[in-house]
Regions:
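Flexible, low-complexity linker/hinge segments
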Residues: 21-30, 165-191
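Conserved pre-ATP/AMP-binding loop-to-beta segment of ANL
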Residues: 44, 161, 175-198, 203, ...
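Conserved AMP-binding/adenylate-forming core of the ANL superfamily
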Residues: 27-37, 45-90, 94-98, 115-120, ...
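Structural core segment of the AMP-binding/adenylate-forming
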Residues: 1, 102-173
Length: 390
């Protein structure tokens, strides 16, 4: 076994910045679970999640979260621990996400595409106490991988599988839910979880996101995107990705009292059926998937008229294709450029069409600071390419 001796240090915001963010109302000193709890109180019987044949109201989601949180503590996890979580598009992703961070346990949200190399790095670098995973990716034996990770990572005490396990060392998630939930044990100033960098420079880096800063990103995004209790959001991109998690994503839907519909199959054939069945109002796509949706719409007979707008981000969307999308899908286009580190840009829903199709928007916050610089770190003239500092 390889034992990593260092721990992950977190440098908090300067006190002056923190005071300013609170004075402006950006930081509300509420945890992610607190924001979910607001919707539980105001919309207890409204549907929060639809995942295949399963569905959860906000009250049911709350109960599952707190019961699982109690089970995690009984198992041996505690506030301050880190875990690696690799769960596909299913309700358990959000249940585990909230159950962990409402107890001060910080998940590293790995993507379904990550394999042993990346997962081993996450576990060792974060000194993860647990690996929580689903096993529904074709060609990937997650349970075998879990056992390999435990051999490689001395800190990894618990392997937790969302379904039936094939080895006594792997705990089934369903056995952890306790009859009674547990009270919250987390702090809005503390790290809620670790996002992953989306760059192409080797293994993704861990990005600590606090409850305060991440909640602000979600709430500010909701205001721009008009998310409400009427929003029905189709999650076709990996649930762990920053875009469908917080821009405004599933968290935005939960905070607004709307409903998240999860798609494990991202094909347009499946997506269009779900749009018709659940009267989806918005979804987030990457450009290649947007192209597939547009192509499928030419011959599909599904009723997708409930769609109000589609977000496209993650890569540059060509102007020509962007101009075609509203006509092909009969809805508005919103372009998004976001970074897991924090900066998020949106075209506004009422922007002129040239702004919507030619740009990826402007920063969501009036206090975002951006600068385009050359190789020497000097600002470049307007219109010239360079590196983005934020």
């Amino acid at each position: 076994m390889t034992n990593i001796q260092h721990t992950l240090d977190f440098t908090p915001w300067p006190q002056e910045s923190a005071r300013y963010y609170r004075a402006k109302g950006y930081w509300q000193d509420k945890t992610l679970f607190d924001h979910l709890l607001d919707s539980v109180k105001t919309h207890p019987d409204a549907l929060a999640i639809i995942s295949g044949e399963c569905s959860y109201t906000f009250q049911q989601l709350h109960d599952k979260v707190t019961q699982l949180a109690a089970g995690f503590i009984t198992l041996g996890l505690k506030s301050g621990d880190n875990v690696v979580m690799q769960i596909s598009n299913r309700a358990e992703f959000y249940i585990c996400f909230f159950a962990l961070n409402m107890q001060g346990i910080k998940p590293v949200v790995a993507l379904p595409a990550h394999r042993t190399l990346e997962l081993s790095y996450f576990c060792r670098h974060a000194q993860a106490k647990a690996y929580i995973f689903s096993d529904d990716t074709p060609g990937f034996d997650a349970q075998k991988t879990a056992l390999t990770l435990q051999d490689e990572c001395a800190s990894l005490s618990y392997l937790i599988h969302t379904d039936q396990s094939v080895d006594s060392q792997i705990t089934e998630l369903s056995t952890l839910y306790e009859a009674q939930g547990i009270a919250q044990n987390s702090n809005a100033n503390h790290v809620a979880f670790f996002q992953l960098s989306g760059g192409t420079t080797g293994t993704p880096k861990l990005i600590p996101r606090t409850h305060n800063d991440y909640a602000y990103s979600v709430i500010a995004s909701n205001a721009i995107c008009n998310f409400s209790e009427q929003t029905r959001y189709l999650c076709v991109l990996p649930a762990a990705h920053n875009f469908p998690l917080s821009s405004p994503g599933a968290l935005g839907v939960f905070f607004a009292g709307g409903c998240v519909v999860l798609a494990q199959d991202s094909s347009p054939q499946n997506a269009f059926k779900l749009i018709e069945q659940h009267r989806i109002t918005v979804s987030a796509l990457v450009p290649p998937l947007a192209l597939l949706w547009m192509k499928h719409a030419e011959t599909a007979d599904d009723d997708i008229s409930s769609l109000k707008f589609v977000q496209v981000g993650g890569a540059k969307f060509s102007e020509t294709t962007a101009r075609e999308l509203p006509n092909k899908l009969n809805c508005q286009l919103q372009q998004v450029f976001g970074m897991a580190e924090g900066l998020v840009n949106y075209t506004r829903l009422d922007d002129p069409i040239d702004v919507i199709v030619k740009t990826q928007g402007r920063p969501m916050s009036p206090d975002d600071e951006v600068l385009v610089v050359d190789d020497e770190g000097k600002p470049v003239p307007v219109g010239e390419e360079g590196a983005l500092l934020t």
